[in-house]
Structures are given as structure tokens and as C-alpha cells.
Amino acid sequence: MPSITPYSNEVHRSQVIRLWETVFGYEAAHNAPGLSIDKKLAAGDGLFFVALAGDTVAGTVLAGYDGHRGWLYSVAVHPSHRQAGVGTALVRHAEQALTQRGCMKINLQIVSGNEGVTRFYESLGYAVEPRISMGKRIPQNITPA
């Protein structure tokens, strides 16, 4: 089983970018992997974790906490490491970090077309909630990394 550790090494960067491109196939500029990494590191919250199989990044999870709710983002497991508990370990690790900060509820979003992952999250205690998710891009903050 890969070990879960905070992202802290620029050596991880290229592997995380490749992983996210493989798993998510980014199309929108605001989701550019390098930009996402830079913005998360700038937040300095210590909520960016990688699963390492030796020196190889096998998975990632980013978490966020606003003082009330926590969020999970970019839960990704390389296809060669799936069905081995890596995703579960990453989510549980992020949950523990959020819980230690006083988080009362954790949310996540599933992109349309990836509904199959719903069962995975339900197996971890998450439930589909009747919500409408809305977003607004801030173009001046979307710059290439």
C-alpha cells in the first residue's frame, strides 16, 4: 500500500501533472494542473496529499477548509493502482486532517459523466444531497503556470 504524505517536493510536481492529465483530462484553463498546484501551495494550508508507491505518485487528494465545511478536490488514483485501497486511504487521510482542524462536514463534487464514482464515495459514508452547484470563473486569476 502506498504511503500518504503531504505534497512537499517539487519532484512530485511533474508526476502529479501527468496523473491529473491521465485521470481528469483537463480542458478548462482554470483547471490547468500546474496552476492548481501553484494556487494550492500558495494557500499554505497543508491540505495537499500524495500517495507514494516508492518514489512514484500513485494518487492525490486536495482538501480545503473554510472554518465550517471541508471540501475534497482532485481525488485521483493512477489506473495501475486502482482497486488497491489507495483512493480510500487518500480520502480517509484528508478526512482526518479536516477533522483535526474542527471540520463539521465534508463536501465534494462529482463532474457530470463521472457518476460511476458515486458508489465509491457512498462506501465511505458520503451521500448525494439535493443541491445545485454554481460557479463563477475569475479570469484575472487564471494565468498559465
Give the location of each predicted region.
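Helix-loop element at the rim of GNAT/NAT acetyltransferase active sites that forms part
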Residues: 17-31
